[in-house]
Amino acid sequence: MSHLDNGFRSLTLQRFPATDDVNPLQAWEAADEYLLQQLDDTEIRGPVLILNDAFGALSCALAEHKPYSIGDSYISELATRENLRLNGIDESSVKFLDSTADYLQQPGVVLIKVPKTLALLEQQLRALRKVVTSDTRIIAGAKARDIHTSTLELFEKVLGPTTTTLAWKKARLINCTFNEPPLADAPQTVSWKLEGTDWTIHNHANVFSRTGLDIGARFFMQHLPENLEGEIVDLGCGNGVIGLTLLDKNPQAKVVFVDESPMAVASSRMNVETNMPEALDRCEFMINNALSGVEPFRFNAVLCNPPFHQQHALTDNVAWEMFHHARRCLKINGELYIVANRHLDYFHKLKKIFGNCTTIATNNKFVVLKTVKLGRRR
């Protein structure tokens, strides 16, 4: 846990999933402080929109103003809810909208934590363009190193005149005034042909490796199991290419596509509808934090390309949680397959959780691992 003192309220905040005490990661950053410094209670008039509030620092601080929190992370929503409870703030103080929803009209203040991907930022700025006015105060913040010329140019192109502040604690802010500059329409998704198939893959803005198949997934697809039956999971499904391949290779199986990103789940659904519509009755689509709330002993197999970062931080906490959830939800003798960068040493982590692990394939960068849920371990 960490403490954030600001002009609105003193907060105790924690990350979600929680980090260990040996290598703790903070649930807020200097950009959050800097953004809050720019606001004074007397000048907040009209609805407050907060975009990409990773762990709820901004939403908790401004809870009295009933803000709307918008993002493409269900984990961020869970983190915000947890931090509201931790600080004794009514959860209903913050309204949550996912990245595919329409934004509230005529907001008084918009606070943006600049996301990692320029594509997501553009999608969000285009959505804001439909609802903000020239009186809306628009402020964005990030680490100074993450604000580039291309970032400022995007604000200028979509919304209007843009300036940036001096750096403070290695953070920088962007101030923007809406004047409705001319702007050509842009598609909601990008699409590309998946080599070796007849499939066209469609990706929403925040999907990993948006413009082509990432090399880890490419390697994983060469080693996916065949002839499985029952329910299997594409955990952290992204655009769903792994799940699509599983549907194709396992015609007797049902595939559950799971991701914490609403855009990822929407992309997966679109890709099944476009490329294998006849298999839709063998699919389930779920926005979730790994397999939280899913009943134990449900699945015959789980397949996963786990992330090793959360927001801008490198961490294996999300992967570790995925592995534990997979073990709980697998049937006895159910199998977990993962692909990962070799340097992450997931072999020993999986062996610690499951009691066994086998290397299926390896190259100079990636490894495909398999582990089995044995009945003797609880």
Swiss-Prot record:
Compartments in which it is found: Cytoplasm
Alphabetical list of InterPro entries matching this protein: DNA_methylase_N6_adenine_CS, rRNA_m2G-MeTrfase_RlmG, RsmC/RlmG, SAM-dependent_MTases_sf, Small_mtfrase_dom
Record EC number: 2.1.1.174
Superkingdom of the source species: Bacteria
One GO CC term, this protein: cytoplasm
HAMAP family membership: 23SrRNA_methyltr_G (MF_01859)
Family named by the database record: Belongs to the methyltransferase superfamily. RlmG family.
Name of the protein described by the UniProt record: Ribosomal RNA large subunit methyltransferase G
Organism name: Escherichia coli O9:H4 (strain HS)
Upper lineage: Bacteria, Pseudomonadati, Pseudomonadota, Gammaproteobacteria, Enterobacterales
Gene that encodes it: rlmG
